[in-house]
């Protein structure tokens, strides 16, 4: 045996270690690491815990072995290197290098028997052995982690067999040499190669070629060969063990829907889509009307008995039947398209084993089963690409030696090539048995390592030689007896999926799962094969000869031809009615791979199979298609909110909103009446003295000065310039009323008034010419329901009314009687797929339908059982065509053939041409209100038509979509007063008017702006008090001032009346499917549908058993139409047909019970702003606001009471004089000058420090009180006198509710009002704010007169104002003060009428029936007459009796504040039984 030299061995060892490390690197993640002596080793690590021991980590287990050293007898000076176990020979040996000798013959087998060497370390990897016999089936892998859910893949073609797994663990101990000793001991590069073992003799002459030795052990791994040609595909091998989990699938389908999003806005209808594939069958509809009988179809030829059709799509699970007997295995069906995964059902009982489906993608590993018995060897699979070294196989028994071949010329083997680069070392195979012993060769010269020599006397096992060239394969020996089982190898890495295994027996039928959710619509399934032929019917009357059919009718029977090619797809047939559910069919072909079930019951072990032959290597297959869709993932996170839904209906009236932001300045109003004089202002702070002016005219009388020494009488000075106006003085006592002045010039236009309360809608007038679009009025409040009046005689038919508003949906009425059947409508487009209903009970058998068109010729069925047949004779030659035979009698029907293979799924047909329009259907129920259309372009106004005769009133139509806006019409009547507009921008300045007549002397004007301070003049001498001068003339009117800055935004208007009901919202998201209802009663047989389209031809089925050979006749002439056979017995129930396309929608069923409320939709986007609501109720007082900013320092208060006298102090130094002006004002009642004004900054501290702390506190308190008097907050604790005061003190504040106390004094009687901070108006709310709408007054008298509501009508009342919580007369007292403090008042009221005239009597054309209004000073305010006592009408909707509610809005403004507020109203046109009214009272506003 030849020893390896150190360098070669070192190379091998290096490669071996590299391979071990590489494998180790590959497996670190896969297998567990090991711990020994506290040191952690990765899987496949090799280490030496001590010099003579070597260990390896194998998947978490430490395997150790002792190193056995080789005997070094022949070494003169063996040395053991430090840290090593075995000695090495250190003598340098010469290395002769000769030419390689010729290759020796194979030696004889040695006869070492059963000598087991010590366990060698893993040898270098041998070349790939020939494919060994198939190993036993491995244990089932452990369950892998579930992969992410993939999308439904298309069913892939089965992948090629996967590559072999990674190398297995080291094999059992080998026979033969001790390679470990060398490995463990290391190699000395200087050692010679040849002399490491037995001394080598000289090379003998080449012997004759020996007989082929027994098969050697697999050699080390060879280099990778070039890929061979792809082999023929082998027969499918048995199903391999489950492969490792596949790569993560494509992202899974989205998780189950989050909670339904809130409904989005309804999109515009899309275009009509192409015809969809049939949806899941809907729930059974109400039975339709019987259809019209179809036309007689042309009689089809009798088809050959069709092959039994493929099972139809599985029906919904029926209620579980009794467990049937185990069925025969069905034929293997083609894989159907994958359905969508249903929701997981409850675990059923284990069913009988179903036929195996095609190999699905790798599922998650199942639970490990018990190991099955070893199966028989499957047929050879296609050869996979060369894999990594497999686990060690069992050693085969040696074959018997073949006969010796003739000695070949040495040239057969060729010169050994240069040594190739080392292959990746494999783990050593088991050592082979020793070859037969060769004769000893003569001693050769020491050449380079020669080929293998003869085996010498059995010596100590040598090292393994280098791989020689591969010998030619010997003939296969007989199969040896199975060797003993090797140690169990390490589990290999998971192989790729094997080819499809042979079909297993069908599983037991599982219990039905829960109903899944409807899957996505599948593609249209293939047309099923024709069902079994029913027995013959009773003889019918002879039909007329039909037109020639598409295929020729059969002549005399020829020999059965081969199956023809598929024909073209027939035209799309119309949808037939669904048949009655069939009985359970035979087990269908396997469906697509289902979701993985729970592990089944363990099967019995199968018998062991025979070993297959090795197949050729196939090319690596493409990756398989992604697997089926997995089970639904966990619920996804809630999705983002959906898009905003459509606007919801208008909400209930909200609470009073916060005041809106200020608007822009409005345009100036028309000139108002002249204002009354302003109130006297408070006294202002005196300015500093001006420069001495020219001597002015005698001034007004001043306050008496301190008495001076009497001076001499001065001369009267000239009239001085007017001084700057002082600040407002305190309020003077009211003087006697002066005579009314002459009418002044018209004032500037006032701001627009507050928006009045919304009026009631007037009755619909006659349709006028189209007006220009008027301003939109505020919607009125809905009236209370009136009493039902007696039915009047029918009036002349009015013009068609405008379309009314959509009423709220009424409650569902009871179901009406069934109407007469309408004419058959056009088939509607298929409705959306409903949820699958439970199968109905079996219906009564329908009448026999007309014979359908002939289907494509089915594949040949197996011949029916005829009588016992004789042995088939040889086939005769084709005979001559015989004459046409006489018509034979109809033969008995043949037995049912087997099902043909299913045809392919046809492509969806193109959309058919639209059919002709059907006759108009009966009118449908009112649909929901359509979405608002886009505004169309304005049409041009048509000429007014002649007035037609009035038609009868139409029924209330369904609200149409909003039409396009028409062109602007002529201006309509005056709309309701709008909300008070925002103050407009100032208009252009008008020209100066002529001076008016002198007015009465006004009250002092408002405080002017203080003038600029003049320089301080020298004090004049104190003069004596002068006499009172005559009153000066009034100055002439000043020129208009510069334009003021724009005013602030107007107050938010009073909330308008409740808007009309909004349009019906978009339908909510569909509720979850209801639980299935109970099965309905058996419906009547539906009418026969029209023939379905001919499906495409299925692929050719396997050829049937050969029929009895007949003489092959040429095709016979067309036979005559056969007579109808007798009516046969009822056939077996056919298999369930394929699912038909959806039928036309049935008539709507009765309204179902309301489903459970769906989940609330998402909050819709804010709806369009509704019309203003009604006046809100007074809000509750807000919380006390935060403390205001610190007020200004108050002026010094009056001196406090004198303190107790202190003890006399020591005399101080003479002090400076005190500035007496600091205390000059303390004793006066009016405000004196601000002492702090005269202090210098450096004096203040010194002077103030002397004040007593008590005085300081008092001053501070007084200061705060004075500040609150000077600048009230409008809170309950610190009310203002009027809103105008608040506006002056806090111009930045917004309009809203504030507290005022016009009579000042105690604040407990303050009242809450609305302050319009744009105008300064104070508005007091009425209480109550409305008079209910009803019939208040009945009178038989024909004479109509005004009836005062508060005074005369039973239940009437005078209108009152202010808070509920004020004492009864408090509001009146406060109102009296408020009138005195104001110069103008205004108020709106709205009169709601039904058959009552409010202002203009349209019939009479006059105002005689107009309302009267009573002011608070009992003055009557009328519709006509003196303009001071007349009201204005903003909108008049009560001009005639229409039987509907209308409203008239009235406004009264006056500068005589004593006339407001309005306290009573007197309608005239009331008293009849159908005459009703109500009143909305607006707030009264004073300015």
Swiss-Prot record:
Probably 3-hydroxylated on prolines by LEPREL1. Proline residues at the third position of the tripeptide repeating unit (G-X-P) are hydroxylated in some or all of the chains. Proline residues at the second position of the tripeptide repeating unit (G-P-X) are hydroxylated in some of the chains. GO terms for molecular function: extracellular matrix structural constituent conferring tensile strength; metal ion binding; MHC class II protein binding; platelet-derived growth factor binding; protein homodimerization activity; proteoglycan binding. The modification Hydroxyproline is found at residues 212, 218, 230, 233, 245, 248, 251, 260, 269, 278, 281, 284, 293, 305, 314, 320, 329, 350, 356, 365, 368, 371, 395, 398, 401, 410, 416, 425, 431, 434, 440, 458, 473, 482, 497, 506, 512, 518, 530, 551, 557, 566, 581, 587, 590, 599, 605, 614, 623, 626, 632, 644, 659, 668, 671, 674. Belongs to the fibrillar collagen family. Type II collagen is specific for cartilaginous tissues. It is essential for the normal embryonic development of the skeleton, for linear growth and for the ability of cartilage to resist compressive forces. Homotrimers of alpha 1(II) chains. This is Collagen alpha-1(II) chain. The gene is COL2A1.
